[in-house]
């Protein structure tokens, strides 16, 4: 009787395990072409963000292009972090790409006050979308520095 009960229990557990392996449809239907293009842009942005290049204007360009075309990107929190930190560094006149304030378009886009506001907006959006982000601690530190009254 014990052998029969044990066999029945093993059979029930195996059927349960198999039914748990059903195909799960993703919560968000992602376009594979847009996802691949966004992943490429993210990779290029990380390379530009790194200590060797510090090309923060390029990072912002890649972010703006990707966010405009595909705001549902699966790794948008990384992009928001890069955009926020790039805005922050540019507002402090850091980086290897020069901002030419004689050109009106660059003067408007890279105005230090506007960059600080953008940094807070991007980092806050990142925290709102993904509160458990691995970039959370650094983002909160920068937001606190830029908005000390809150």
What kind of feature is each model-predicted range?
Residues 2-6, 15-150:
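Acidic, polar-rich low-complexity tracts and alpha-helical solenoid repeat scaffolds
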């Amino acid at each position: 009787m014990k052998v029969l009960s044990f066999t029945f229990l093993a059979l029930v557990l195996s059927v349960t395990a198999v039914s748990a392996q059903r195909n799960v449809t993703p919560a968000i239907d992602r376009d594979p072409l847009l996802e691949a293009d966004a992943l490429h842009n993210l990779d290029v942005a990380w390379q530009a963000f790194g200590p060797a290049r510090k090309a923060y204007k390029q990072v912002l360009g890649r972010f703006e292009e990707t966010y405009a075309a595909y705001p549902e990107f699966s790794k948008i929190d990384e992009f928001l972090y890069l955009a926020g930190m790039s805005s922050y560094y540019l507002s402090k006149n850091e980086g290897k790409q020069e901002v030419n304030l004689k050109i009106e378009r660059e003067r408007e886009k890279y105005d230090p006050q506007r960059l600080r506001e953008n940094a807070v907006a991007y980092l806050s959006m990142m925290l709102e979308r993904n509160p458990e982000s691995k970039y959370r601690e650094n983002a909160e530190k920068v937001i606190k520095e830029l908005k000390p009254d809150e």
